[in-house]
Design a protein with these regions (language model features):
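Helix N-cap/capping motif at the beta->alpha junctions
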Residues: 8, 30-39, 60-62
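Active-site beta3 strand of CheY-like receiver
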Residues: 44-52
């Protein structure tokens, strides 16, 4: 399975990418900003996108909207991740187009369960 991980923090990117790849089930593509992430989503067609919702862009929800508007990427599930753990953040993420939401700091086992659940859903 192919995962696209969009994360602006190099340490977080390396750590989570490495842990996911060690599971043996995943090929992990990395993007350091939302523009690169959206382009990779179109060209690589990952099975799921892990998207940092705290990217340094004017509108942090724009990458989600962009991916869900594009016919080539609209059906790729997005797991939004944010340091804001309030219910309102989850609700906003889901309303904007995320299929799942995970609060940071990431609990790896919980995220892995979420990724596998999303990948198991019929398309």
């Amino acid at each position: 399975m192919k995962i696209l991980y969009v994360e602006h923090d190099d340490d977080n990117l390396y750590m989570l990418k490495t842990r996911l790849e060690r599971c043996g089930d995943f090929e992990v593509l990395a993007a350091e900003d939302s523009e690169q992430g959206c382009k990779l989503a179109v060209t690589e067609r990952p099975d799921v996108i892990l998207l940092d919702l705290e990217m340094p862009v004017e509108d942090r929800w724009e990458p989600v909207r962009t991916l869900k508007k594009d016919l080539r990427t609209r059906n790729i599930p997005i797991i939004g991740m944010s340091v804001y753990a309030e219910a309102s953040e989850r609700e906003k993420a889901m309303a904007t187009g995320c299929d799942e939401f995970d609060a940071k700091p990431i609990e790896f086992d919980n995220l892995l369960t979420t990724v596998r659940r999303v990948l198991a859903k019929p398309k």
